[in-house]
């Protein structure tokens, strides 16, 4: 197995950039496979911006001077935060990993760091490290933990070139100092917190500068070669990265305008979306996605060989609002019943159809019918292998099918349908 993984690394993972080549270790390749198996994750945006109830970009959108914004730390005291509740929320929803903001664009660190006093332990009356509690609880409950980390910083004086969205920032910073600061924090996150499996970078898109990824990625993989690195730069994968992400779009789509240059590479894929229209807590955003829409996003992502990372913004007191818990309880019940067709699957290579998608695991194909076709059957083109059996996943009842040279017809007459996703399991030889 180890030799096979190393060979995969040389064929798929090694990306040449100049004279340097990143070759992932066997442990890293195994972590990639496990990442793809998990399929469903929880994204959490939480910080002092949550107090204002207007999303994580409130400092920018409301043009709040940095010195004024920093005062929010004086009032941030999330006494209702409970790491166990967060982790169990994810588990009950069928999620296998959590990605949480360790530091967002406002520069405030949500963990105890020695690299800056502007952090939740030193700058707030809370004086505790919620990410340490979360990391420990994730280990206890068997949930993987990834840290979101912002590359840009709206407040630090050494953030080079200043920032056009914050009044009073110097035109020039100390780029070497800023890179050193990030490396110090990343070292803390990887070495201090138990069970960390990934780093999720964001903010590259603000400036066309040398982010010193060779140093930063090299440091991370030196500290822990199995750590998975992803970067929300909206570009094709770069040297040293281990998975590719897509923001608010499925791989290959560009409805948001973010993914115009995101050519799909050979790395594991992940797409992220919000449960309403905001990443951070927004008290006026009531545009909650239905459980059916979330299930469809999860299924469509899996059909395109991608994970689905669903975001919530907890309230400033640390609690998750009931609208989220109610919706995700329904999603979790569906995933518990139909997880065989999601977890551990890969995209079948068969293009998405008007009625749905197909996932694959071993010799089984899972036909996800999410939109009822006009005719009493679905047609599956380009199917390799001979189908020996077709059955409804929900109860194992037989489903009629006919295989021809051009594809397979699966007949839906008399099949008990699911309002979210009717899944038919095809077994091939």
Where are these regions (language model features)?
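Bacterial Sec-dependent N-terminal signal peptides
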Residues: 1-21
């Amino acid at each position: 197995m180890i030799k096979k993984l190393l060979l995969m690394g040389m064929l798929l993972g090694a990306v040449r950039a100049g004279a340097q080549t990143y070759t992932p270790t066997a442990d890293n390749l195994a972590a990639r496979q496990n990442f793809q198996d998990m399929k469903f994750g929880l994204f959490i945006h939480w910080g002092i911006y949550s107090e204002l109830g207007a999303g994580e970009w409130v400092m920018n959108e409301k043009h709040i001077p940095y010195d004024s914004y920093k005062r929010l730390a004086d009032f941030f005291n999330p006494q209702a935060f409970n790491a166990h509740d967060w982790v169990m929320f994810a588990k009950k929803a069928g999620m296998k990993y959590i990605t949480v903001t360790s530091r967002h664009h406002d520069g405030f660190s949500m963990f105890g760091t020695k690299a800056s006093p502007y952090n939740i332990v030193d700058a707030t009356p809370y004086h505790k490290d919620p990410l340490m509690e979360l990391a420990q609880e994730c280990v206890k409950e068997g949930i993987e933990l990834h840290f979101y980390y912002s590359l840009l910083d709206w407040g630090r004086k050494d953030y080079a070139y200043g920032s056009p969205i914050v009044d009073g920032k110097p035109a020039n910073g100390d780029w070497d100092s800023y890179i050193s600061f990030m490396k110090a924090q990343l070292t803390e996150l990887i070495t201090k917190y138990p069970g960390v499996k990934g780093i999720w970078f964001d903010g590259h898109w603000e400036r066309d500068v040398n982010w010193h990824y060779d140093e930063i990625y090299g440091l991370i993989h030196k500290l822990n070669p199995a750590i998975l690195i992803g970067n929300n730069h909206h570009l094709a994968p770069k040297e040293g990265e281990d998975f590719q992400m897509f923001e608010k779009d499925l791989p290959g789509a560009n409805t948001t305008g973010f993914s115009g240059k995101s050519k799909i590479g050979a790395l594991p894929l992940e797409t992220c979306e919000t449960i309403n229209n905001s990443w951070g807590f927004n008290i006026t955003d009531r545009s909650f996605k239905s459980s059916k829409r979330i299930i469809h996003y999860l299924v469509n992502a899996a059909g395109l060989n991608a994970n689905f990372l669903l975001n919530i913004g907890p309230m400033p007191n640390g609690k998750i609002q009931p609208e989220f818990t109610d919706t995700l309880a329904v999603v979790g019940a569906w995933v518990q019943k139909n997880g065989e067709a999601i977890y551990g699957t890969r995209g079948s290579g068969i293009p998405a159809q008007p009625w749905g998608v197909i996932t694959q695991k071993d010799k089984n194909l899972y036909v996800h019918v999410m939109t009822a076709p006009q005719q009493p059957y679905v047609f599956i083109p380009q199917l390799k292998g001979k189908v020996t059996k077709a059955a409804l996943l929900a109860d194992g009842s037989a489903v009629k099918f006919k295989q021809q040279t051009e594809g397979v017809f699966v007949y839906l007459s008399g099949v008990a349908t699911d309002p979210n996703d009717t899944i038919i399991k095809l077994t091939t030889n």
